[in-house]
């Protein structure tokens, strides 16, 4: 009986979604996107799409999203939005970071990306246009992946800060006390594997099409580059997401080394009280700001 009720509710929800979808205006980008997708399927193998497609998506999105933060250091107007104004970026630091990033991308992440095709084949994940999910279902699954990754990240990140292992692995990521966008994936290879596992758990549980893999890569990179940007930009649309950590939240983690362990959402830090120092610091800064006015 309970099973029948659940099926009935699911069917009703699906019908409601279909009805709302029928009322929405036609997406002008859908036809060009469909043509490009079909062309890709006709001209490339699944292995090429899964491997080189995933690599291109990752590298393009990573450096494209990192570019604004890199340019901000040369724009005097943007200085007022930099969170740690007393710690400007240096050429030496950024060059060291870039070399570390490229090593991780091509010697750690690329071998993992090469397994994407075998992953999709093992789990029967489709590539075809006919089974392409609607954008809002993909978005919902990406949010599900974000919740799963954030949970994994909080507890494993906190473990990496344990005094007995911190200096061996996670200390590499904290070489930069004032983070900047491209530094988001600068880490010890073991950390890349440990924290990166959280990215794949959601994919294993929720992936219904290869497009979700690329959409989730895009969302995760956008988020991690934003929180590592070192800038608190007004009207940043990401800051309107409920419980979103944001640049100030994670910047404090780099400045203080303790607390604010979550990657995307604030609830785990709030539940376990690991944001107490952060809130005390923000209150102190507010009082100092009022006194200086």
Swiss-Prot record:
Keywords carried by this UniProt record: Cholesterol biosynthesis, Cholesterol metabolism, Endoplasmic reticulum, Iron, Lipid biosynthesis, Lipid metabolism, Membrane, NAD, Oxidoreductase, Steroid biosynthesis, Steroid metabolism, Sterol biosynthesis, Sterol metabolism, Transmembrane, Transmembrane helix, Ubl conjugation
EC number(s) given by UniProt: 1.14.18.9
Segments carrying motif Histidine box-1: 157-161
Necessary cofactors: Fe cation
Gene Ontology molecular function, alphabetical: C-4 methylsterol oxidase activity; iron ion binding
Catalytic activity: 4,4-dimethyl-5alpha-cholest-7-en-3beta-ol + 6 Fe(II)-[cytochrome b5] + 3 O2 + 5 H(+) = 4alpha-carboxy-4beta-methyl-5alpha-cholest-7-ene-3beta-ol + 6 Fe(III)-[cytochrome b5] + 4 H2O; 4,4-dimethyl-5alpha-cholesta-8,24-dien-3beta-ol + 6 Fe(II)-[cytochrome b5] + 3 O2 + 5 H(+) = 4beta-methylzymosterol-4alpha-carboxylate + 6 Fe(III)-[cytochrome b5] + 4 H2O; 4alpha-methylzymosterol + 6 Fe(II)-[cytochrome b5] + 3 O2 + 5 H(+) = 4alpha-carboxyzymosterol + 6 Fe(III)-[cytochrome b5] + 4 H2O; 4alpha-methyl-5alpha-cholest-7-en-3beta-ol + 6 Fe(II)-[cytochrome b5] + 3 O2 + 5 H(+) = 4alpha-carboxy-5alpha-cholest-7-en-3beta-ol + 6 Fe(III)-[cytochrome b5] + 4 H2O
Processing and modification events after translation: Ubiquitinated by MARCHF6, leading to proteasomal degradation.
Pathway in which this enzyme or protein is active: Steroid biosynthesis; zymosterol biosynthesis; zymosterol from lanosterol: step 3/6; Steroid biosynthesis; cholesterol biosynthesis
Annotated GO biological process: cholesterol biosynthetic process; sterol biosynthetic process
Highest taxon above the source species: Eukaryota
Similarity section: Belongs to the sterol desaturase family.
Full protein name: Methylsterol monooxygenase 1
Species: Rattus norvegicus (Rat)
